[in-house]
């Protein structure tokens, strides 16, 4: 993993304020189209954000019913306003996308025909200083995607032992100076709690050797990514969410996943690859029907945005797209 893009081009689902440019929009719509053209098609956007992808899908498929899920109540309300012309065809739900099976049960939906996951942090979360996601602002150290949850980045920074902070920075941020950063935080909080993004960014910068700060973007980018992942349990939720959502995908239904760093992409690749592989034990004379692939991969590896898109929308630069189609019942 190369880490987050610089703050001027961070990983996430949109573009600099005030515009919102959905990442790889045309490709997402193209990949999902064959599954959504049938009468009565239902799609789930598990990371609704500001609703850019959802709007394009609803416009492209006049008979489509769309379930939009987001853990951020602010984003959900903005998406509701954006999607108001399609109000009779949408169900918007405040939830984490690992809850998709429960949500579908409550809506009386058995199978869906399209699944979309656009991972990472959204434009408003990065652009609104008070959310505490960005190291370019001095703001309360928050980083909660869902502000109804209690634990913040400040809670983690000020209460986790040095060993656990080191693990988070090393595993989630792939930060080679994880231990030095953790020790700097522990020393600082012994004097005064670390409460703001500015203080944390300065601590991280001072903990990293000067030679290592000369390249690779802002020195705090990996540490901030790691804390955000820990605050929001992003990877553990993704691990649960993909198999859970795929269990409700109809035959010939399609899934598209956009990820923005290698940890997300690694999980996505593993889940889709496992379900697209024949798991018949070696040595058997014939394949076992229940061990045949459930999915067919639609992308060769991870697809990248075009140079034209990244030039117009730098925040798309780190995007990686994978897609698959269900070929049999699970």
UniProtKB/Swiss-Prot annotation:
Note the HAMAP family from the entry: 16SrRNA_methyltr_H (MF_01007)
What subcellular compartments does it reside in?
Answer: Cytoplasm
A Pfam family matched in the record: Methyltransf_5
Q: Which reaction does it catalyse?
A: cytidine(1402) in 16S rRNA + S-adenosyl-L-methionine = N(4)-methylcytidine(1402) in 16S rRNA + S-adenosyl-L-homocysteine + H(+)
Query: Family per UniProt?
Result: Belongs to the methyltransferase superfamily. RsmH family.
Compositionally biased spans, kind Low complexity:
311-321
Its organism's taxonomic lineage begins at: Bacteria, Bacillati, Actinomycetota, Actinomycetes, Streptosporangiales
Q: Where is this region: Disordered?
A: 276-330
Q: What does this protein do?
A: Specifically methylates the N4 position of cytidine in position 1402 (C1402) of 16S rRNA.
Query: Which residues of the sequence carry a binding annotation for S-adenosyl-L-methionine?
Result: 51-53, 70, 118, 125
Q: Where is the signal peptide?
A: none
Identify the EC number(s): 2.1.1.199
Q: What GO cellular component entries does it have? A: cytoplasm
GO biological process assignments? rRNA base methylation
Q: Tell me the InterPro entries matching this sequence.
A: RsmH, SAM-dep_MeTrfase_MraW_recog, SAM-dependent_MTases_sf
- What domain of life is recorded for the organism? Bacteria
Native species: Thermobifida fusca (strain YX)
Q: What is this protein called?
A: Ribosomal RNA small subunit methyltransferase H
Cite the entry's keywords alphabetically: Cytoplasm, Methyltransferase, rRNA processing, S-adenosyl-L-methionine, Transferase
Q: Which SUPFAM superfamilies does the record cross-reference, listed alphabetically? A: Putative methyltransferase TM0872, insert domain (SSF81799), S-adenosyl-L-methionine-dependent methyltransferases (SSF53335)
Q: Which GO terms describe its molecular function?
A: rRNA (cytosine-N4-)-methyltransferase activity
